[in-house]
């Protein structure tokens, strides 16, 4: 079997990068990245990745960064990590300055030639983990993917690197979960005589939404699901709105439910249950269970015929179709005077319940069922 590698940056990834001069040149500056020990130790013990540290240390060995100020902190870092079961198969340090344009300096691959075009290694299934766009660019140059230790990826879009980024997060818990349990992404295309619908989502995203159904208020409601659950959600709908809103709303619910069901995969490690009770002038309660048995309990009344362009009679139908397609039990109750706030509260409560139920625990990676099946 080919070997997989984690090419791991040092400063800003394993340890906090000193904010003033960006040099870890004293023991006093040594501070480890939050939760790196537990998660990198877990990855090292549970998964079959080789660990290769790849770091640029500007001018190491020159008067601007003497060797005797570098090695004490570096060696203590390695000793501390080793004490937690985290060791490296290789440590590669480039000493050049940026203006040198050295072939060995990240994002160039001069230090990594032994891993390139080597039949022993599977670079396509390997990752670069780092906090700078140059780390993502290194992944691109190696032919692997990147785990970007930043929340936003706007700077990657500008450089055309977004496709290389498999995960963007500042949380090592999410890094370990991603590497151990895999991605939870799905795409669904639903085409009928009445509608053509595309849905894609990432359950472990950042709440990014790109939604267009042709019904402005419906778009606004669906955006609440993505935003408040944390999932990345894209929905594109072409429906027969010239006839009626029914098919557009119903088929969107079906496609979204199917997409959630597919992305859930085995359901191992998930919380399974979720509930939320947000307050505005309305009280909205949504409880759900990903137990595999769809059912809807609906206790919400609306007096207006429409909110925006969306018929209120379709609210129940949307959640029934969603429940059936996602194979989840939904119990929804809402009270209040403002019709807009009431349905928006339901969608927000659903999103928060989803966020709770979809959460995974890789340290208790079991099926949440005494029956052994969901």
Curated annotation (Swiss-Prot):
Transmembrane intervals: none
Pathway: Amino-acid biosynthesis; L-histidine biosynthesis; L-histidine from 5-phospho-alpha-D-ribose 1-diphosphate: step 6/9; Amino-acid biosynthesis; L-histidine biosynthesis; L-histidine from 5-phospho-alpha-D-ribose 1-diphosphate: step 8/9
Binding site for Mg(2+): 9, 11, 131
Cellular localisation: Cytoplasm
InterPro entries recorded: HAD-like_sf, HAD-SF_hydro_IIIA, HAD_sf, His_synth_bifunc_HisB, HisB_N, Histidinol-phos, IGPD_sf, ImidazoleglycerolP_deHydtase
Domain of life: Bacteria
Necessary cofactors: Mg(2+)
GO cellular component, one term: cytoplasm
Main location: cytoplasm
Protein name: Histidine biosynthesis bifunctional protein HisB
Underlying gene: hisB
């Amino acid at each position: 079997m080919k070997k997989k590698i984690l090419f791991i940056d040092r400063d800003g990834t394993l340890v906090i990068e000193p904010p003033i001069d960006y040099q870890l040149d004293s023991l006093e500056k040594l501070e480890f990245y939050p939760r790196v020990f537990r998660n990198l130790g877990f990855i090292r013990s549970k998964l079959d990745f080789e660990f290769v540290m790849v770091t640029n240390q500007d001018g190491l060995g020159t008067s601007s960064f003497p060797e005797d100020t570098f090695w004490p902190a570096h060696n203590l870092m390695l000793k501390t990590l080793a004490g937690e079961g985290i060791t490296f198969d290789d440590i590669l340090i480039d000493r050049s300055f940026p203006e040198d344009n050295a072939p060995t300096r990240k994002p160039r691959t001069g230090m990594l030639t032994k891993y390139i075009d080597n039949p022993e290694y599977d670079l396509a299934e390997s990752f670069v983990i780092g906090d700078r766009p140059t780390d993502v660019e290194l992944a691109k140059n190696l032919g692997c993917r990147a785990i970007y230790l930043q929340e936003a990826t706007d700077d990657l879009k500008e450089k055309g690197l977004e496709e290389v980024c498999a995960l963007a997060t500042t949380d090592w818990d999410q890094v370990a979960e991603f590497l151990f349990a895999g991605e939870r992404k799905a795409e669904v295309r639903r085409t009928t005589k009445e509608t053509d619908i595309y849905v894609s989502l990432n359950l472990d995203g950042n709440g990014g939404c790109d939604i267009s159904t042709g019904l402005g208020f419906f778009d606004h409601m669906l955006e609440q699901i993505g935003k408040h659950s944390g999932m990345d959600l894209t929905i594109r709908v072409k429906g027969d709105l010239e006839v009626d809103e029914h098919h557009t709303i119903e088929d969107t619910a079906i496609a979204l439910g199917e997409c959630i069901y597919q992305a859930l995969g085995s359901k191992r490690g998930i919380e399974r249950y979720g509930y939320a009770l947000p307050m505005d002038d309305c009280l909205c309660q949504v409880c759900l269970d990903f137990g595999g048995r769809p059912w809807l309990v609906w206790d919400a009344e609306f007096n207006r015929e429409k909110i925006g362009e969306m018929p209120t009679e379709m609210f129940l139908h949307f959640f029934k179709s969603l429940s059936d397609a996602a194979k989840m039990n939904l119990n929804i109750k809402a009270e209040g005077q403002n019709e807009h706030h009431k349905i928006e509260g339901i969608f927000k409560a659903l999103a928060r319940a989803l966020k709770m139920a979809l959460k995974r625990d890789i340290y208790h990676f079991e099926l949440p069922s005494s029956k052994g099946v969901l």
